[in-house]
């Protein structure tokens, strides 16, 4: 639905909602400063047509690193800059550990699952998920072995093209999805499996829809716009279809479950469900299982595959960087064995390049919303319990106080004077604090092993001259996606 139509709908209903709102109790607390809101519409008129991120960055310049924006009728506190975000999410981690609502997802997730829950439910599910993923990551077939095998499958597929140009999106989706599938479902899929391809298409389409302007406007006025057509309905339809597949998979697992030999995340969860079946207050029930699997599958597929897509577009844009990475690969690994995770500490330049790709591309610029779990005093302001808080991760990843050239791609941001990898507190593509991304470790391992294996086996070429390659993302909302492109993988 067009922005102008959405705005008209909001305006025509705003007055009635305003009248109703006057009879509601007023919010207590002392919020950070921000633009003066209109009744019901909030700060809609201060929103940039380019999206929420652009709007928030402009408001940061005027109001500082902590400010309040009314997204429709509700106040949301914005946290900008490295120091501010760390002070809230790390130093006051418990107070800021609640999960805010993502309006386009809420009809499906409804506060369930390991990513979208809060309080004791979240703590219980996160402890279980971390332990389970760690156990399967360090067992007989470790995550590293799975990634290496998948990387080899990819190399064989790319060799079939014999240097012909291709769009790498499909293959990057397949390899990343297969890793999370092996952990959650206990199996990997052939790249031609119709069910697998359909699931990948649903995830890709949903991710793109969530980045649209329509979805961003929906976050402001979901209470009204949920009754009208829009991207939110397709998102719910897609997610429900994925949930149906997960539910079917859970039933197959239940029918073939061997308590002495759990195969994957689902088996382990089912065993825990059985153990706690007499506990009427347990969080280990079907709803939390399917939403947790949906969350892990969705979050563990699209963000990492999109990072890989951007990685090789950047390598085409800056071929001298790709050449330096390949030189380091040749020196440390050579051509006769697979890259391993142990190689990472011996390859500071490659590691710095991957860090810089994540920083520069900034794929989740706003991050998932938080919510304060109690009345919270922060920098002299009293933020009332249950107020939503947005950590603007982009403002840290592009923080000029921490990065010399924040808007340029420069691996030197992560190298010291001796060429060794250096840490940077502003590097938080996975967020930070207690709600840091559950799959951070797996994602980092995937990026290193896939990136190095591809560059070990192939040189890169583009049908377009480097100076004409566009790195500007298609969307700059809650998520970013790179432009579509063609690439030649030339066997080395």
From Swiss-Prot:
Kindly indicate whether the keyword Heme belongs to this entry: yes
- Note the Gene3D superfamilies from the entry: Cytochrome P450
User: InterPro entries per the record?
Assistant: Cyt_P450 (IPR001128), Cyt_P450_CS (IPR017972), Cyt_P450_E_grp-I (IPR002401), Cyt_P450_E_grp-I_CYP2B-like (IPR008068), Cyt_P450_sf (IPR036396), Cytochrome_P450_fam2 (IPR050182)
Supply one GO molecular-function term. iron ion binding
Phosphoserine PTM positions: 129
Q: Where does heme bind?
A: 437
Give the EC number(s) listed in the UniProt record: 1.14.14.1
The primary site where this protein sits is endoplasmic reticulum
Q: Which family does it belong to?
A: Belongs to the cytochrome P450 family.
* A Pfam family it matches: p450
Localization (cell): Endoplasmic reticulum membrane; Microsome membrane
Q: Which cofactor does it need?
A: heme
Chain's role = Cytochromes P450 are a group of heme-thiolate monooxygenases. In liver microsomes, this enzyme is involved in an NADPH-dependent electron transport pathway. It oxidizes a variety of structurally unrelated compounds, including steroids, fatty acids, and xenobiotics.
Q: How would you summarize where this protein is expressed among tissues?
A: Expressed only in differentiated keratinocytes in skin.
Give the way it sits in the membrane: Peripheral membrane protein
Q: What does the record give as the reaction this protein catalyses?
A: an organic molecule + reduced [NADPH--hemoprotein reductase] + O2 = an alcohol + oxidized [NADPH--hemoprotein reductase] + H2O + H(+)
Species whose genome carries this gene:
Mus musculus
Q: Which UniProt keywords apply?
A: Endoplasmic reticulum, Heme, Iron, Membrane, Metal-binding, Microsome, Monooxygenase, Oxidoreductase, Phosphoprotein
Protein name from the UniProt record: Cytochrome P450 2B19
Cellular-component GO terms for this entry: endoplasmic reticulum membrane
Please give the PROSITE patterns that the UniProt record associates with this protein: CYTOCHROME_P450
PANTHER family membership: CYTOCHROME P450 508A4-RELATED, CYTOCHROME P450-RELATED
């Amino acid at each position: 639905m067009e922005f102008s139509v959405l705005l008209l709908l909001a305006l025509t209903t705003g007055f009635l909602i305003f009248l109703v709102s006057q009879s509601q109790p007023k919010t207590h607390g002392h919020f950070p400063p921000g633009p003066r809101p209109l009744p019901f519409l909030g700060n809609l008129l201060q929103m940039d047509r380019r999206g929420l991120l652009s709007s928030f960055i402009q408001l940061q310049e005027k109001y500082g690193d902590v400010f309040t924006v009314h997204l429709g009728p509700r106040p949301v506190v914005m946290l900008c800059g490295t120091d501010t975000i760390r002070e809230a999410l790390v130093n006051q981690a418990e107070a800021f550990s609640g999960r805010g609502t993502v309006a386009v997802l809420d009809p499906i997730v409804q506060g369930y699952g390991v990513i979208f829950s809060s309080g004791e439910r979240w703590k219980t599910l996160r402890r279980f998920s971390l332990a389970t993923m760690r156990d399967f990551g360090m067992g007989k077939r470790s995550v590293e072995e799975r990634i290496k095998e998948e990387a080899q499958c990819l190399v064989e597929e790319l060799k079939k093209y014999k240097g012909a140009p291709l769009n790498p999106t499909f293959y990057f989706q397949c390899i990343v999805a297969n890793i999370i599938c092996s952990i959650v479902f206990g199996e990997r899929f052939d790249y031609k499996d119709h069910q697998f391809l359909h699931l990948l298409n649903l995830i890709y389409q949903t991710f793109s829809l969530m980045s649209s302007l329509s979805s961003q406007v929906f976050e402001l006025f979901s209470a009204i716009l949920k009754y009208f057509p829009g991207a939110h309905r397709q998102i719910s339809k897609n997610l429900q279809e994925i949930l149906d597949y997960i539910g079917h998979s859970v039933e197959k697992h239940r029918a073939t479950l061997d308590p002495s030999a759990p195969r994957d995340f689902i088996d382990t969860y089912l065993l825990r469900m059985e153990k706690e079946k007499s506990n009427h207050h347990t969080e280990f029930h079907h709803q939390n299982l399917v939403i947790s699997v949906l969350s892990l599958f969705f979050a563990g597929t699209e963000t990492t595959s999109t990072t890989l897509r951007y990685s090789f577009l950047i390598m085409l844009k800056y071929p001298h960087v790709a050449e330096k990475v390949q030189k380091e690969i040749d020196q440390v690994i050579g051509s006769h064995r697979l890259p391993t995770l142990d190689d990472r500490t011996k390859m500071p330049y490659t590691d710095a390049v991957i860090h810089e790709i994540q920083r520069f591309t900034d794929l989740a610029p706003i991050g998932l919303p938080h919510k304060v779990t109690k009345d919270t005093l922060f920098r002299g302001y009293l933020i009332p319990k249950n107020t939503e808080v947005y950590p603007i991760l982009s403002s840290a990843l592009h923080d000029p106080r921490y990065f010399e050239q924040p808007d340029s791609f420069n691996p030197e941001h992560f190298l010291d004077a001796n060429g060794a990898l250096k840490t940077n507190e502003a590097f938080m593509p996975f967020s930070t604090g207690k709600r840091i991304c559950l799959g951070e470790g797996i994602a980092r391992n995937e990026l290193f092993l896939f990136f190095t294996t591809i560059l070990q086996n192939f040189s890169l070429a583009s049908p377009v001259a480097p100076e004409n390659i566009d790195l500007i993302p298609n969307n700059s909302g809650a998520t970013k996606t790179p432009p579509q492109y063609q690439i030649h993988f030339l066997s080395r």
